[in-house]
Amino acid sequence: MPEFLNPFSGKLPDRKLTLEELIRAIRLDLAAEHEAVHLYMAHADATDHPLARKVLIDIANEERVHAGEFQRLLNLLAPDEANLMAKGAEEVDEMKNKLGL
């Protein structure tokens, strides 16, 4: 998550990212959103303070919206992404059907 110890984490490169580099960066951003959801929900589950739980769950849900935005951008930048994700979903559906669920 935070990279406060890395003095170069906020430094801009001396050139623009290539499309492939941007795609990798967006994948990393997407992973960070999922990690944030996990962290905030774990904190919410670990407390019985009602206001803290409500705020943490609300923030986690906002991160899920961000994840959707990054996923959509990734699908637009890498056209094969949506097809591969759909293939993965089909494989899970096949397993589900074999189990009769």
Residue ranges and their predicted role:
Residues 1-101:
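Iron-associated oxidoreductase/ferritin-like identity signal
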